[in-house]
């Protein structure tokens, strides 16, 4: 794909996301997206077959951005680092937090989150399969449990169902990942057992 085609696709995606925020639940048409992207309707069809295709492309683009952020922060050296995953997610989402809040309230499975879960589970499983002595189905279960839990909590926070500051949320999810529901007591540290 040449730069001009990529620029047109990017304009279509941006127009689609902007209209999603503005219209909040009202039907968006291809004509509206084309007009907002400053292209002809027939140009839209040169790049996408439907608005669903645009939504999936937008999700893929955001996921690609997240993977770059995760790589930059070396997340894949320790892919079960909840705190780092939360901070990387937030780095991606913060600039467009109103859009993500809206989309997470409407139908979180339609945009980004389901692709995120599938991709992260696949990546974690691939990365760890040669590093951990664990049968592949068990490793996949751990990855699914971890990623599904993190994304569910993050979506609930975006929906403002969990009224905690971001840093506290990230910290608590990290504790839950390490200790489960049995939060360690202050006297249960390694220092007191020595």
Report the location of each language-model feature.
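Short, basic, alpha-helical segments at the C-terminal edge of helix-turn-helix-like DNA-binding modules
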Residues: 29-30, 58-67
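Short hydrophobic/aromatic patch on the recognition helix
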Residues: 38-48, 150
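Amphipathic alpha-helical packing segments from all-alpha helical-bundle domains
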Residues: 107-132, 137-148, 182
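C-terminal peripheral helix-coil segments that are non-catalytic and often amphipathic
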Residues: 148, 156-194
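Basic, helix-initiating cap at the start of DNA-binding domains
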Residues: 1-23, 27, 32, 36
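Residues that mark the N-terminal boundary/hinge immediately upstream of a DNA-recognition element
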Residues: 29-30, 50, 165
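Hydrophobic alpha-helical connector segments
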Residues: 70-98
């Amino acid at each position: 794909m040449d730069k001009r085609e990529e620029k047109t696709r990017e304009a279509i995606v941006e127009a689609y996301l902007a209209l999603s925020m503005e219209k909040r639940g009202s039907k968006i048409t291809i004509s509206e997206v084309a007009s907002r992207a400053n292209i002809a309707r027939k140009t839209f069809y040169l790049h996408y077959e439907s608005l669903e295709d645009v939504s999936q492309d937008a999700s893929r683009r955001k996921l690609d951005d997240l993977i770059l952020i995760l790589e930059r922060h070396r997340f894949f050296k320790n892919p079960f680092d909840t705190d780092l995953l939360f901070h990387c997610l937030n780095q991606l989402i913060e600039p467009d937090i109103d859009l993500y809040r809206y989309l997470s309230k409407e139908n979180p499975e339609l945009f980004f989150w389901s692709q995120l879960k599938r991709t992260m589970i696949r990546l974690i499983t691939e990365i760890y399969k040669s590093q951990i002595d664990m049968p592949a189905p068990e490793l996949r279960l751990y990855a699914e449990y971890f990623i599904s839990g993190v994304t569910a909590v993050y979506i609930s926070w975006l929906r403002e169902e969990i009224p905690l500051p971001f840093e506290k949320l990230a910290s608590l999810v990290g504790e839950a990942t390490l200790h489960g529901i049995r939060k360690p007591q202050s006297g249960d540290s390694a220092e007191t057992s020595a």
